[in-house]
Each structure stands twice: as structure tokens, then as C-alpha cells.
Amino acid sequence: MLSPKIRQARRARSKSLVMGEQSRSPGRMPCPHRLGPVLKAGWLKKQRSIMKNWQQRWFVLRGDQLFYYKDKDEIKPQGFISLQGTQVTELPPGPEDPGKHLFEISPGGAGEREKVPANPEALLLMASSQRDMEDWVQAIRRVIWAPLGGGIFGQRLEETVHHERKYGPRLAPLLVEQCVDFIRERGLTEEGLFRMPGQANLVRDLQDSFDCGEKPLFDSTTDVHTVASLLKLYLRELPEPVVPFARYEDFLSCAQLLTKDEGEGTLELAKQVSNLPQANYNLLRYICKFLDEVQAYSNVNKMSVQNLATVFGPNILRPQVEDPVTIMEGTSLVQHLMTVLIRKHSQLFTAPVPEGPTSPRGGLQCAVGWGSEEVTRDSQGEPGGPGLPAHRTSSLDGAAVAVLSRTAPTGPGSRCSPGKKVQTLPSWKSSFRQPRSLSGSPKGGGSSLEVPIISSGGNWLMNGLSSLRGHRRASSGDRLKDSGSVQRLSTYDNVPAPGLVPGIPSVASMAWSGASSSESSVGGSLSSCTACRASDSSARSSLHTDWALEPSPLPSSSEDPKSLDLDHSMDEAGAGASNSEPSEPDSPTREHARRSEALQGLVTELRAELCRQRTEYERSVKRIEEGSADLRKRMSRLEEELDQEKKKYIMLEIKLRNSERAREDAERRNQLLQREMEEFFSTLGSLTVGAKGARAPK
């Protein structure tokens, strides 16, 4: 019999041991909801430090803290583990714990990954399966090593690019570039590249090394298939694929359109590609270009475009909910879409990303960037210099969609020079050339986008054509002035007409996004730039350049005659404006202003009407598609209900037949029982009468 003091001491000791399980991490428990979203959650078994028994707890990973709860629905956690300065280690099952999936979280930072000390402060956890344990270990390592440059497997692409920005501008993460460079150097002629799997243990070791912030180097002893499997694993474990989940249906629609009309589908696909986030755009372009290099050796490595599309399609383009029905329905479309992305990558990715910032030089400069393009021309014109230098012939394929913009400084002290202009390329197929001198030609396949370099202010006219008709040299005494000064701005010569083409924003940077967006306002766009006019007519006549219009794939066939007539009227108006100079430069003709305003108003109305009609048609088609989808769902639901009713009817018929048979059997049994009762009573009566007769003679 223990005394009360001993019992009280034991209770206090056991209570302190239990409470010690909750206070493993020193410091005050942080609020879980303030640490961001849940990175991972699930059931794990935790071993107590003293009693060594297992307790099942609900673990939640938020930020750099691992909380555990008694139940899934609990709000207040029982305890937490701070992952800063810790390491996670997988433990092999021992003789005492056979078949258990154990891992340990113990103190230790970078450089101590290979050490597994027997630390009494380590937390031993057990998962329900090997896959569950691997997922938990990867998630915890990602949290531990992400601030140190690791944990890239399963990390969002934007976060990886943002962290690696300190190493300089890159088109893809360092892991992808390292794998691609190694395969490009040693594996392009390897048979079955990307199809044959690598060594699983080596892939796992490389993944752990990259996740722990290390940068392992590949040498001649490294297996090419292992590196290829590592690259596929990185793409597969991205939380959101290269093509985001929100764009999955849009890209599948492009694939369906490609099967019907390849030209329209390619144009729509280029538009969807250009709308991707910049990190996704760069990585997709990098991978497609590399896969095109791989398929160039298909006669040796046996990996054609279709094979590469089959391997990489599900890793680059996958639905958010990966159910078997959705995957089976989209497999062929994804493969076809990936094939087009590889084959036509030079046409679809037309805006190259600059390698890095370049220092401005004293001559002509042309910089083309993803999502933006600017043509900067130095305005250091010499008096009496040559009239027009040779320029390049540039063509923009109809499938190329580039959104090009530049911001010009404004202010009371800023000047607009004719030597520095912003040019925006539309989505029409166009070309411009000078019949006398050509210094370059467009590259085949639209793999690169060449921008004309002109010594004086260039023009973009209606269908994206650059007309040199308005280029004039300023004489030696001419100087640039503001828009309200002596020299007046010509709408046709020096600025793109705002609202004429959806792909051409005005000088005030008013964007026109697709045919479904509203038209940009044209007011006030003519007063943000100045123009240079020449002083002699000989210079004007020498600067005349012809331009030719190629067929432009407009969305509506009824729009072509109006556009051609409008082009012709604009050409005549521009020629008349350039040949008929006013006698005094500071007194512009009112007729010219009225004509330009009328043409601008007409074009704006036509574009607005077309935009409105197209928007209505798209809404109607969308409503019809939604109604059709609802009807199909209702039909399928009614068919299911009809099948159920048929089954119920059959069951009722069977029950009815069974009940009839049971009733007939019951009637037969009743009749038989009635006959037996009658026989019994008759026999009983005869026996009674016989007994009475036998007693009577006595």
C-alpha cells in the first residue's frame, strides 16, 4: 500500500512526462492560421519519448512549423515542431519494427544530412505506407531547404525562378538547364531517350541532393537515362504544371481546333501561349526547343515527335482533377497539341527573351523581349547626311502573337525625338520591303522576329505594315518641338492610327485585348508625340517606298473589302498629305484634319460593331453550348432513371409472379387440409356411433 505522498509524486511525474511531449519545441506556440496555407496534412503515428508507445495524431504542415492534433476536427493543436535548423531522415525498418515506415526529425542543418545521430530530442514518426512516408519527407525537406536554395522538387515554378534570379536571367530553372545541357552533350544519340527509365535509386539520390540545396555535377559516368528521368520527375512534381490548370481547357480547345483548321488552330494556340505567365512561357519554350533538337536525331535515338509528345504531354499539360475518364478523353488531344508545340515552336514562340541587360550604344539598337518590344533609334542625325539607310525586311507570321509595349517618359521637361519611337507589332501577317536596297531577309519558320531599323521616325499603318513614305529628314537647322508647336503631327505619316487594328495600341498605350474586349478610346492619342517634316521637296521624293500587303487572316470574310478599301484610302490620303506640303508649316489644313477624323471615326465604328457582333456571337455560342451540355446531362440522368424504372418494373413482375404462385400453393394446401378435416370428422363420428351401439346391449 503506497502512501498518499508517493502516489501524488508519481501522478506529478507522469503528468510532467505527458506535458513534455507537447513542449518539444521551446518557445510560445504560434498561431497556425497566421503561417499561411496548409502545405500537407495527414495521419501519422508519433512515438512518445519516455513510454515508447505509438500515438496516432493528425499532422498539419504550415509554413516552417509542423503541428499535430488529437483529431482531424480539433482546432487547438496539442503541440508543434519547428523545422528551422532540423533535418529529416528516413530510417530503415529494424528487427523490432519490421514492415514499418519510419522517419525522424532531429536537430541539424546544412552539411549534416548524412549524419544520423541518436539524439534524444529527435521525433520519430511512422507513416502508413512507403509512398506516404516519401511524400512527408519531401514536403518537410522542401520547407527546410527552400530558404537555402533547395527543395525545388514540388516547389512552384514562380518561386524557383524568383529564388534563382540572383544567378542572372535564365530561361529555365538551373536543374532543367543542367539536365538539358548534359543530354544535349552526351545523350542525343542514345536509343530510347526519355522512354527507357533510369536507375530508380540514383534518381532518388539526385532528387534528395537537389532538395537539400546541393548542386551535384554530372560526369561521364552518369547514366543519360537517369538524368532524363530526373528531368521528367521535376516536371511531373510541379504543383501546377507548365501549362496552368486554368488554361487546360483553353489548350484542349486549341487542339480540337487544330484538327479542324490547322491555320486557325495555330493562330489560337500562339495566342494562348503568349498569354502564359512569363516563367511558364520561358520554360515551355525552352523544353519545346530542346525536344525539337532531340527529334532531329530520331533516326538514331528512335524518338520521333509523336513519341516525345506521348512522354512529355502528360507532364506539361494535365488536368487539375486527374480522374481516369478525363485523362482518357484528353490523351489524344494532349499528344496532338504537344506535337504541334514541338514542331512549330519557332512560329509559336516568336518573342525571344533577352539574355541580360545590354548597355546602350551610340548607334541603332533593337531589343526584343517576351511580352514587350521596343525599337530604339538614336536621334543623332547629322546635317546633310544620307537620306535613308538600308533596312531589314521583316515579316510576322499569322501564327505569331507578340504583345509588345514600352513606356516613354512624360513630363514638362521631356522631349519626344524622331529618333526614338515605340513600334507595336500586330497579329496580322504583313511584310514591308524597299525595292532598292535590302540588308536582310526574314528567317525561315518565323523562328526569330526581325524589327526594321530606320534612321528616322517609322510608321505602323493599318495591317501592321511599316511605311517609309512618312520618313523625312530634318534639315540642319530644324529642331524638335512639342505637339502644340509650329510643326503639326500628321496622323498618316508619323503615328499609328489608334483603333485601326486591334493589335496596335495607340501612343497613349491603350491596349486592345482580343476581339472580345472593348475598343480603346482614340481621343488624346494624337497629342503625345511630335513629328519632323522636311524643308525641301527633293528629300521627300527620295524617301518614297512601296509596300505590299499580304493576305491577312481576318476572323470575318465580310471584313476584307472594307479593310482593303480603307487601306487604299489611307494610302491615297498619306500620299496626298506627303506631296502637298502647306506653304506655311505652322498652318495645317483643316481638310486634312477633317479627313483624318472622319476616317478614324469610321474605322472605330466598324471595329466596335465587329467587336460587338463577335461578342454577341460568342455569347450565343456559349449559351447554346451550355444549354446543350445541360440537355446532355439531363438526358443521361433521364436514361439512368429510365433504366432504374425498368429494373424496378422487372423486379415487381417477378414479385407478382411469386406472390401468385404462393397464393395458388396456399389454396391447394387449404383444400387438402379441408378434405383431411372432413375425413377426420367423419371417422371420428363413426367411431363415436359404434361405441354407443356397443354399450347399449349391456
From Swiss-Prot:
It is found in: Cytoplasm; Nucleus. The keyword Transcription applies. Residues 549-558 have a biased composition (Low complexity). The modification Phosphoserine is found at residues 359, 395. Pfam families: PH (PF00169), RhoGAP (PF00620). Residues 590-687 form a coiled coil. The record marks 195 as: Arginine finger. Residues 559-571, 587-597 have a biased composition (Basic and acidic residues). PROSITE patterns: PH_DOMAIN (PS50003), RHOGAP (PS50238). InterPro entries: PH-like_dom_sf, PH_domain, Rho_GTPase_activation_prot, RhoGAP, RhoGAP_dom. Keywords: Angiogenesis, Coiled coil, Cytoplasm, Developmental protein, Differentiation, GTPase activation, Nucleus, Phosphoprotein, Transcription, Transcription regulation. One of its GO terms (molecular function) is GTPase activator activity. Residues 424-436, 484-493 have a biased composition (Polar residues). Residues 155-349 form the Rho-GAP domain. GO terms for cellular component: cytosol; focal adhesion; glutamatergic synapse; nucleus. This is Rho GTPase-activating protein 22. It comes from Homo sapiens (Human). The lineage of its organism: Eukaryota, Metazoa, Chordata, Craniata, Vertebrata. The gene is ARHGAP22.
